[in-house]
Amino acid sequence: MEIKTSRIVILILVVVIPAILIFRNPINLGLDLRGGTSVVLEAQEEDGKKLQPDTMDKVREIVQRRVDGLGVSEPVIQKSGENRLIVELAGVKDAQEAIDLIGTTAKLEFKIKTGDNSYGPTVLDGSAIKNAYVQQDQFGKPMIGFELNDEGAVKFAEITRTNMGKQLAIMLDGKEQSAPVIQSEIPGGKGSISGSFTYESAQNLANLLKAGALPVNIQIMETRSVDASLGAESIKATKMAAMIALVLVSLFMLAVYRVAGFVADLALCVFGILTAGLMCAIGTTLTLPGIAGFILSLGMAVDANVIIFERIKDEIMEGKRFQDCIDDGFNRAFPAILDGNITTLLITMVLFFFGTGPVRGFAVILTIGVLVSMFTAIFITKIIVKIFVNIFHLNGEKLFGLKGVE
């Protein structure tokens, strides 16, 4: 029985490339495994007006930019219903700081101050901000520098030219941050906001200004924190459960299918490496439901091998030539494996499009696992079987422990 060199090369690449990806880009762990913070935000209707259809999309985009400023890896930000947003931040160091940053409306306004606590109408707002950053004043204290877009720069120059000697109040969410006296016209669209800032608070405000103001008021409805130690315990328990399941499955395959069972165990190892490698490549976040999806797909991979081996045994018992039995067994097993996996994929599609959070994570991992299990069962297992048959000169009796067959 000949086996093409190209297929052996493919087998090697299927193992080596995912292994490199796993080593260089470890799998992202979700909130329940790594620890972190989950926040539920709700957009508030103003003056009885219903939210516009695209309002939550704008809120999500702005919250995404704010979270990016925190440096959190792989945040999960998704809509829930018509007016809610779920934000999951795994591994965040300061939960309260993150919550404050996410939930702040950050409505920036420039107003001419007319008295101690009175202001004129808004002459410029945060929509004109092009960039914001932290810089130091003459005393080395942090303040926020900002740059305006072209339209904002022209308007800012006009405001400062026509209001010399007056105070220009810089307001954030209705609170005065600073109110410098306009000494001269300010061209170029650059300015600064000073105040009693620490470096961290200045950086947060700069991030808020860069991300932009939320189009509606947001209320924090729920916050939930998961301690990192709980995530570590979950990982430990899950690893133990997965190892026990893997050992039991491996022993079962060895006991029932002998050498072919060992081949199936090797194929399962390839399945695990390839699945993890794909998760790293596409940046999938692994959660506890995702692990459940992986273990379920592992079981489906075992089922596929069982179907294949039973078909091969049927071919052998019919007295066909052994080399033909292997090819025919794989070919006849393929329709049953395909049908079973397609029905599972249809279910995962429903879960992904109509589910939220953990349910979608489960669906994504299960989908990856099902696709990989089909590939490993039909292609990888066949290559390994033929390699074993060629090297060890196996027949039906040696491969499956069948008596009285060649």
Swiss-Prot record:
It is a multi-pass membrane protein. It holds the Pfam family Sec_GG. The keyword Nucleotide-binding does not apply. GO terms for cellular component: plasma membrane. The keyword Transport applies. GO terms for molecular function: protein-transporting ATPase activity. The chain crosses the membrane at residues 8-28, 240-260, 262-282, 289-309, 334-354, 361-381. InterPro entries: Acrflvin-R, SecD, SecD/SecF_arch_bac, SecD/SecF_CS, SecD_1st, SecD_SecF_C, SecD_SecF_C_bact, SecDF_P1_head. It is found in: Cell inner membrane. Keywords: Cell inner membrane, Cell membrane, Membrane, Protein transport, Translocation, Transmembrane, Transmembrane helix, Transport. It comes from the Bacteria. GO terms for biological process: intracellular protein transmembrane transport; protein targeting; protein transport by the Sec complex. Part of the Sec protein translocase complex. Interacts with the SecYEG preprotein conducting channel. SecDF uses the proton motive force (PMF) to complete protein translocation after the ATP-dependent function of SecA. Belongs to the SecD/SecF family. SecD subfamily. Forms a complex with SecF. Part of the essential Sec protein translocation apparatus which comprises SecA, SecYEG and auxiliary proteins SecDF. Other proteins may also be involved. This is Protein translocase subunit SecD. It comes from Sebaldella termitidis (strain ATCC 33386 / NCTC 11300).
